[in-house]
From Swiss-Prot:
Belongs to the complex I NdhM subunit family. GO terms for cellular component: plasma membrane-derived thylakoid membrane. It comes from Crocosphaera subtropica (strain ATCC 51142 / BH68). This is NAD(P)H-quinone oxidoreductase subunit M. Its EC number is 7.1.1.-. The keyword Thylakoid applies. It is an enzyme of class 7 (translocase). NDH-1 shuttles electrons from an unknown electron donor, via FMN and iron-sulfur (Fe-S) centers, to quinones in the respiratory and/or the photosynthetic chain. The immediate electron acceptor for the enzyme in this species is believed to be plastoquinone. Couples the redox reaction to proton translocation, and thus conserves the redox energy in a proton gradient. Cyanobacterial NDH-1 also plays a role in inorganic carbon-concentration.
Amino acid sequence: MFVKSTTRHIRIYAAEVHNSELVESDNMLTLDVDPDNEFNWDEDALQKVYRKFDELVEAASGEELSDYNLRRIGSDLEHFVRNLLQNGEISYNLKSRVLNYSMGLPKVESPETEGAYNL
């Protein structure tokens, strides 16, 4: 079994994709963002996740390729996705197979609460 990290919205594998199959690799990581399509993504938001992934991998270069190190990267990316959601850069996909609001209930502004909950 190859080294991997899986969170709700981020999956990282020490593998390459060949003919739609993952093949173990010691020098290639494969990133799968939001595999259940829980969020609505635009290209800019996805590119931010990819850039953050590249930064985290670069920062970890020279370290052992282990489940632990990949989980650290995956956890950091999961928090990054949460920030994108909280900043309104992505939103919940209301047509998703399952609506579980895993990162908190959606914020809906109303005239009574507009601006009242700014952090």
